[in-house]
Amino acid sequence: MVASTLSPPTRGWFDVLDDWLKRDRFVFVGWSGLLLFPTAYLAIGGWLTGTTFVTSWYTHGLASSYLEGANFLTAAVSTPADSMGHSLLLLWGPESQGDFVRWLQLGGLWAFVALHGAFALIGFMLRQFELARLIGIRPYNAIAFSGPIAVFVSVFLLYPLGQSSWFFAPSFGVAAIFRFLLFLQGFHNWTLNPFHMMGVAGILGGALLSAIHGVTVENTLYEDGEQANTFKAFDSTQEEETYSMVTANRFWSQIFGIAFSNKRWLHFFMLFVPVMGLWTSSIGIIGLALNLRAYDFVSQEIRAAEDPEFETFYTKNILLNEGLRAWLAPIDQPHENFVFPEEVLPRGNAL
């Protein structure tokens, strides 16, 4: 008998750290967590701080914090002043020079929340990739989450980068987002943009598919319990199906004359529709950043200008957009000191 004197191979610090990060725990950390948790913490903390204490008086001429009397719907972390351009507004940068209060007054907190928020979303996507790899499933969760990331990055970062400054990005607040929607309509005619139309079709179509799928499964559950509530009859370890795909197919074939017969294709379609809606709307926002125009039906505008009795919903919307620009711009951009004389303000044909 020979006694072995070989010692087990030593493990480096990287292997030890890798094991610790990937350990099975209540809240998975992983390598992606090194990006996700700090950035998400700082973004959410920055937003809570801004909506609680920080004014927008110096950037927008507005009260935007709980301290000033705003509520949950009207509080916001507002975009930096237009004069700041596309500066990263670092606390130690030339604008603030290390003065924390001045940094808040200039809108530095918005850049802080936007950039950390973007990296937090990317970290969450990487988290889904990492966990899918570890437990051996496909990465479609992460691929689908690219939709919300595309929307956030295009709306909060790429759109203002195409405009004159961060000022024209949405501020982080409920009413602030509504203001941004009105701005997009008035200055870009966003609702007539085909990419917006595809986005609406994708999001509402995804909601419709989700509702149809849910009720179809509920309608075709096997009668495997004694109670009216069927939830308790389900066992997560059961081998047999819990609902009848054949019956569902028969039902929708009679309703529409066509139905899904392949569960895999059905669920891919449910993934594809809303994610494609998010992607297409993001492409449209990038177009707006470059000031690309939506559909222009010039012939209708010319005829409406020549014929007081001719008006379409399109020409009416064009006048509404002119009104939005004329009355929104002086309030939205007080630093420009816009003054529009009465004769240039839009009027409907009926006037």
Curated annotation (Swiss-Prot):
Residues that hold chlorophyll a PD2 according to the record: H196
Membrane topology: Multi-pass membrane protein
Binding site for Fe cation: H213, H267
Residues binding a plastoquinone, per UniProt: H213, F260
Binding site for chlorophyll a ChlzD2: H116
Quaternary organization: PSII is composed of 1 copy each of membrane proteins PsbA, PsbB, PsbC, PsbD, PsbE, PsbF, PsbH, PsbI, PsbJ, PsbK, PsbL, PsbM, PsbT, PsbX, PsbY, PsbZ, Psb30/Ycf12, peripheral proteins PsbO, CyanoQ (PsbQ), PsbU, PsbV and a large number of cofactors. It forms dimeric complexes.
Cited function: Photosystem II (PSII) is a light-driven water:plastoquinone oxidoreductase that uses light energy to abstract electrons from H(2)O, generating O(2) and a proton gradient subsequently used for ATP formation. It consists of a core antenna complex that captures photons, and an electron transfer chain that converts photonic excitation into a charge separation. The D1/D2 (PsbA/PsbD) reaction center heterodimer binds P680, the primary electron donor of PSII as well as several subsequent electron acceptors. D2 is needed for assembly of a stable PSII complex.
Record-given protein name: Photosystem II D2 protein
Gene from which this protein is expressed: psbD
